[in-house]
């Protein structure tokens, strides 16, 4: 597995949109995304001015079914 990229929340949201995820709603500084192909699965993305922490990014990618290489390609 390659190293996770450093990415901000807004860029991660745009990358996930390319994979079929959509913004369901926002709650404060967090965006909740869903995918029609994966009912019941939601991803919560923090949208702050800093990059998403590696552990958080790893969990987001795991829920989305994406690898580090795939997210680098999408960003």
Spans of model-derived segments:
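N-terminal first-folded block
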Residues: 1-27, 36
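Residue-level preference for alpha-helix termini and adjacent loops
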Residues: 3-6, 44, 51, 73
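A short, structured beta-strand/loop element
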Residues: 23-59
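C-terminal structural segments of small proteins and small subunits
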Residues: 50-75
């Amino acid at each position: 597995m390659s190293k996770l990229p450093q990415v901000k929340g807004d860029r991660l949201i745009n990358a996930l949109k390319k994979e079929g995820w959509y913004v369901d709603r926002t709650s404060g500084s967090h965006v909740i995304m869903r995918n029609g192909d994966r009912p019941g699965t939601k991803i919560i993305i923090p949208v702050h001015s800093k990059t998403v922490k590696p552990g958080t990014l790893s969990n987001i990618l795991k829920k989305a079914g994406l690898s580090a290489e795939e997210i680098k390609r999408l960003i």
